[in-house]
Amino acid sequence: MYLEQVKTELFEAQDVLNKFISNEQNIKLIQQAALLISDSFKQHGKVLSCGNGGSHCDAMHFAEELTGRYRENRPGYPAIAISDVSHLSCVSNDFGYEHVFSRYVEAVGQKGDVLLGISTSGNSKNVLNAIEAAKAKGMKVIALTGKDGGKMAGLADVEIRVPHFRFADRIQEIHIKVIHILIMLIEFEMAKIRQ
């Protein structure tokens, strides 16, 4: 009944991934982002992550794998997804939804920390505001974007962009792969100081 559609979806996902992998710069940027976060951890910094919708779920998944466990038994790492419901509802009500992430960065972020901002369009106003707040605090910024990078293009210290223009879910599929690789590389890098 839907077998051909299933195959078409899987082949399209594979095509987007292959195009992303074929750009060697993407591979280098993933490594650069992982080292940026690891360097922050080594200096007693932390990573904050944020996004909307599916990207919010990715931001939470990223943080929980770092504080919890990914593939290796190791110490937890200082990662916080900006996802506290009481904070989000308070700031949304009092200041507006476009400030939910930036207010948290202003309150908790410190020089030497890292912000991971995730937006498939690169145009999420609340993530853009968080980037601005992070830069004002002397934090490093990593952005996971899609399409042409939107308004986030050029704002981050490291931008990992999935140049796909059809559906956001295809971009999110690459983002979650990137997130898993970041965590793996962070584990590798942090293991060096435990040896």
Curated annotation (Swiss-Prot):
- Identify the InterPro entries for this entry: GmhA/DiaA, Phosphoheptose_Isoase, SIS_dom, SIS_dom_sf, SIS_GmhA/DiaA_subfam
Q: Single GO cellular component annotation? A: cytoplasm
| UniProt keyword list | Carbohydrate metabolism, Cytoplasm, Isomerase, Metal-binding, Zinc
Q: What compartments host this protein?
A: Cytoplasm
Give the matching SUPFAM superfamilies: SIS domain (SSF53697)
Could you give a GO molecular-function term held by this entry? zinc ion binding
Query: Per UniProt, what is one Pfam family of this protein?
Result: SIS_2
Q: Which residues does the record give as substrate binding sites? A: 52-54, 65, 93-94, 119-121, 124, 172
General remark: The reaction produces a racemic mixture of D-glycero-alpha-D-manno-heptose 7-phosphate and D-glycero-beta-D-manno-heptose 7-phosphate.
Which NCBIfam families does its entry note? gmhA, PRK00414.1
* Record-given protein name: Phosphoheptose isomerase
| The organism of origin for this protein | Histophilus somni (strain 2336)
